């Protein structure tokens, strides 16, 4: 399997990815769901972390590429939906979820962190939604979570426009 679930003390579960480069595939998503099932029945919380060089370099892009090339669109849509459903389940589970990223937390690894209730990141953590670099949009809900977290910082009545948006609007109005 791509992940191991273990009790790390005080009944807290830890989910440790063990796939190559801690990539996220169906086996890891199944393990996340299993860990949530276990934690919600008998444990006070879930930590997602590992001792590898990197937290996770994201989805298995090779698998996604092959599905697209072979025009297996139903399987590709199912894989994306399974990832999204798993992230939403993690976000709204009845137990606290903690992500402990370190090293690289890219793409899906970043999205897992964004859906956790708490993130305890190592000082040298390189995190981001890098999907645009390979020509795709983040599929696990990371863009939504990033926008929601940013909006939590706004105060009632604030107008939040970055410089690019402001210049773009100026060009359109004149």
Explain the meaning of each model-derived region.
Residues 1-19:
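Short beta-strand/loop segment at the start of cytosolic alpha/beta domains
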Residues 10-16, 29-74, 84-100, 122-126:
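A structural preference for short, pocket-lining loop segments at secondary-structure junctions
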Residues 174:
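Conserved small/polar residues in nucleotide/adenosyl-binding loops
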Residues 106-168:
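CoA-thioester-processing core
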